Curated annotation (Swiss-Prot):
Keywords: 2Fe-2S, Cytoplasm, Iron, Iron-sulfur, Metal-binding, Oxidoreductase. CDD domains: HCP (cd01914). GO terms for molecular function: 2 iron, 2 sulfur cluster binding; hydroxylamine reductase activity; metal ion binding; peroxidase activity. This is Hydroxylamine reductase. The gene is hcp. Its cofactor is [2Fe-2S] cluster; hybrid [4Fe-2O-2S] cluster. Catalyzes the reduction of hydroxylamine to form NH(3) and H(2)O. NCBIfam families: hybrid_clust (TIGR01703), PRK05290.1 (NF003658). GO terms for biological process: response to hydrogen peroxide. It comes from the Bacteria. It catalyses: A + NH4(+) + H2O = hydroxylamine + AH2 + H(+). It comes from Shewanella pealeana (strain ATCC 700345 / ANG-SQ1). Hybrid [4Fe-2O-2S] cluster binds at H252, E276, C320, C408, C436, C461, E495, K497. Its EC number is 1.7.99.1.
């Protein structure tokens, strides 16, 4: 086992990365190794998909499958070995299908088929033990003794960034947003990563290419969500429980939430969002359901306590899932799509009757809590509508600075930094937030500036797209570069979606971003130095020092 993809990975003087019998996320060494093998075979599939495109062959079923299966290897997504093996054997079948189609087309065109890389050639073993032995050649730091650590760091930066982009591609696909061009570029990058390049410049440029690709994917996802559910509107949301039977929906998938709302109409079941599903309550086509009563709980890392005390059924539509046996709720949590946990019921198709039956069999909340309201829904359309007023307040001096404080949440004590920087930001500043990092402060009161709320909740992590659109609008209004705006980005990272959002911002030329609470363990000191020199990227330090620096306080 070797895994270094998330913030909680092991860091020791001897080296970084989880390499024992179990990762810090709870992933077993077998699961980790099987995921590595899956990625390796997927790189072979993408290699053939890229070659097939050169001779005019596009297989949309495979274009859909590869990002989805890749998504299953993100942090806290799928811990079910049998599901991972099934993805891997299906990937080999697809690879062989593309191989046959490509070679037949080359023969038809009387041209030579191009040479195969290693992931295109591996023949899977027939059993789990055989596959585990094959995983040794698929480990993400393969060749570490022969290549410089900076090359390995760049490979991992690209691999984990592309994982994040794959997740957003799958979220977009669920909402009928696909692109042959995006899929083609994705396959090209996957194929390149399967070649284990030692070209530092090419790897760095590929990381920027992944960021650019993800910008297009986030635009597709934005289009899919707004087309299906309308543009988010500023909306007050109750964060307390309501008497009645209950279903809790966590993850990121708005479509699954809509299906659950449709199927629970008139059944006396209240539906709650959790974690990154909170922004759903601002979409007109979702909040129209009266039994979507509010948001329960907070960010992913608190689920073992929050799900244990939730008296209803729970649905995980995407990341992040952690061991449901700890809170003894494994018999009432359900997984969807790419999510998996051994022994937990997995919902296939669009029928949530098992979830509904479980909710009906449970007690539910026995009384109404006193409501506590927070305001959400300041996504792209709402921000653009407010832009003229915001610009007036900037010109008048009422608003002097913007902070974007968001990203992933986690349980490290150092993450209190993000609460403190939001609460200690000057009263003449506006704080934008997104992702589950918002839970560090989104229930606090920040007041307003001439009617403009000082805290603007943009949405999910992918709604960084909305923040980018606001920054572009402001830079155009003030006729300046984005980096000349009174805007400070403070990003909390935990996993691969945050990595690709960071790559997106860097690829767009956004500079002077602060990230924390720690730097990714796969980034070597040399790579961190390059990113600081090129983009001004730096780690958070102390709230006082960082605020003084960005506000130019002596």
């Amino acid at each position: 086992m070797f895994c270094i993809q998330c913030e909680q990975t092991i860091r020791t003087p001897a080296g970084n990365g989880c390499s024992y019998t179990q990762g810090m996320c709870g992933k077993s060494s077998d699961t980790s190794d099987l995921q590595d093998l899956l990625i390796y075979i997927l790189q072979g599939v993408s290699s053939y998909a890229a070659l097939a495109r050169e001779v005019g062959i596009i297989d949309h079923e495979i274009d859909t499958f590869v990002p989805k299966a890749f998504f299953a290897t993100l942090t806290n997504v799928n811990f079910d070995d049998e599901r991972i093996i099934a993805y891997t054997t299906q990937a080999e079948t697809f690879r062989n299908r593309l191989k046959a189609a490509y070679e037949a087309k080359c023969s038809e065109l009387n041209i030579d088929a191009k040479p195969m890389n290693a992931p295109m050639q591996l023949v899977l073993g027939a059993s789990k033990p055989e596959m585990l032995s094959q995983a040794l050649q698929a480990v993400p730091n393969r060749g570490k003794d022969e290549v410089h650590e900076d090359i390995m760091g760049l490979r991992l930066l690209c691999l984990y960034g592309l994982k994040g982009a794959a997740a957003y591609m799958e979220h977009a696909r669920v909402l009928d947003q696909t692109s042959d061009e995006v899929a083609g570029e994705f396959h090209e990058i996957m194929a390149f990563l399967g070649e284990d390049s030692v070209d530092a410049d090419k790897l760095f440029n590929t990381a920027m290419q992944i960021g650019q690709l993800n910008y297009r994917v986030m635009a597709m996802l934005d289009e899919g969500e707004t087309h299906a559910f309308g543009h988010p509107e500023p909306t007050q949301v109750n964060t307390k429980s309501v008497k009645g039977k209950a279903i809790l929906v966590s993850g990121h998938d708005m479509k699954d939430l809509e299906l659950i709302l449709e199927q629970t109409q008139g059944k006396g079941i209240n539906v709650y969002t959790h974690g990154e599903m909170l922004p759903a309550l601002a979409y007109p086509e979702l909040k129209k359901y009266p039994h979507l009563v509010g948001n329960y709980g907070s960010a992913w890392q608190n689920q073992q306590k929050e799900f244990a005390t939730f008296p209803g059924a729970v649905v995980m539509t995407s990341n992040c899932i952690i061991d449901p046996n700890v809170g003894d709720y494994s018999n009432r949590i359900f997984t969807r799509s790419i999510v998996g946990w051994p022994g937990v019921t997995h919902i296939i198709g669009d029928d949530f009757s098992e979830v509904i039956a479980k909710a009906e069999s449970l007690e539910g909340f026995i009384y109404d809590e006193i409501p506590h309201l927070i305001t959400i829904g300041f996504a792209r359309n709402a921000l653009m509508a407010a832009a003229p007023t915001v610009i007036e307040n900037v010109k008048s001096g009422a608003i002097k600075h913007f902070f974007l404080v968001g990203g992933c949440d986690g349980d490290k004590q150092e993450r209190g930094y993000f609460t403190d920087i939001a609460t200690q930001a000057p009263a003449d500043s506006v704080i934008l937030t997104l992702g589950c990092g918002k839970y560090k402060f989104n229930k606090l009161e920040f007041g307003d500036i001439n009617g403009i709320p000082r805290l603007l909740d943009i949405g999910q992590c992918n709604d960084a797209y909305s923040a980018i659109q606001l920054a572009i609008a402001l830079s155009e209004a003030f006729e300046c570069d984005i980096n000349e705006l009174p805007l400070t980005l403070v990003l909390s990272w935990f996993e691969q979606k945050a990595i690709v959002v960071l790559l997106t911002l860097l690829s767009l030329g956004v500079k002077n971003i602060m990230t924390g609470p720690t730097a990714p363990a796969f980034l070597t000191p040399n790579l961190a130095k390059v990113l600081e020199e090129k983009f001004g990227l730096r780690n958070t330090t102390t709230v006082e020092a960082d605020l003084n620096r960005v506000l130019n306080v002596a």
